[in-house]
Amino acid sequence: MGLEEKLPGGVLLASVEKLANWSRRSSLWPATFGLACCAIEMMSTGAGRYDLSRFGMEVFRASPRQADLMIVAGRVSQKMAPVLRQIYDQMPEPKWVLSMGVCASSGGMFNNYAIVQGVDHIVPVDMYLPGCPPRPEMLMDAIIKLHEKILAGPVTGRTAHTESGSSPYPKPIDVATARAGLPAGELDTRTLSVNDRKRFRIPAGAPVPTGRGAVEPVLDTRRPAAIAPPSVFGRAKGIPVDAKPLDESRAHGPGPTTADIADAADTADSDAAPGATHDTP
């Protein structure tokens, strides 16, 4: 009809993108994914005092297939990481992730083997929110900033995962593979930290991850010795310097039985000083 000759190029396409992004920004449905104390502040944000429904987010969906925003509120344990990734993969595209609190963003005070040191090791994060825990006003400010990012972003959302590995975001982790502890070749190890590798039990001799946290050449998953070296822990815990390690045949077996405890008590009584008496009830 000659309409394209009267309008500058790209006007209709730009209008469609803006309309689509405006619709997505105005109707974000978060997934119910509270993990720790930050979830209390997230629930307060949805209550009447702050009224998150003003921004079109009054519905927290219990099904990830009906949500497009994941608010990770709290620390993520190593056992929760595969579940988090599975829920993220079940969310339809386009989708966004908001890391709420320092525990979800970087591990926070939980710098140990049981906590993932940042949820960005598992899923791509679009907005980081500091605080321990952040107040509802801070969460609403982060959501508004995310709205602005969505409005200015492409209509196709973020870059999709590609088989060639050109995407800057982690690839999906197979939950069954991660729980089974299979070799590292069947996992995406580009972004696995040391704690993540311990969680997925990458065996000795497997390819070393190249992501952040990959410091040791080999991760040995064998069980530790029964007794730590006395030079390190002996004096602090009262272990004699000449203490001998436990029998290897029993070090990894079941704990001591009642008979073993009784034998140890008899041995201690026989080694007591002469003339020592014990009160009996």
UniProtKB/Swiss-Prot annotation:
Keywords: 4Fe-4S, Cell membrane, Iron, Iron-sulfur, Membrane, Metal-binding, NAD, Quinone, Translocase, Transport
Cofactor(s) recorded in Swiss-Prot or TrEMBL: [4Fe-4S] cluster
Classification via Pfam families: Oxidored_q6 (PF01058)
Biased composition (Low complexity): 257-281
Subcellular location: Cell membrane
GO cellular component, one term: plasma membrane
Example GO BP: aerobic respiration
Assigned protein family: Belongs to the complex I 20 kDa subunit family.
Assembly behavior: NDH-1 is composed of 14 different subunits. Subunits NuoB, C, D, E, F, and G constitute the peripheral sector of the complex.
Record NCBIfam families: nuoB_fam (TIGR01957), PRK06411.1 (NF005012)
Protein known as: NADH-quinone oxidoreductase subunit B
Organism for this UniProt entry: Frankia alni (strain DSM 45986 / CECT 9034 / ACN14a)
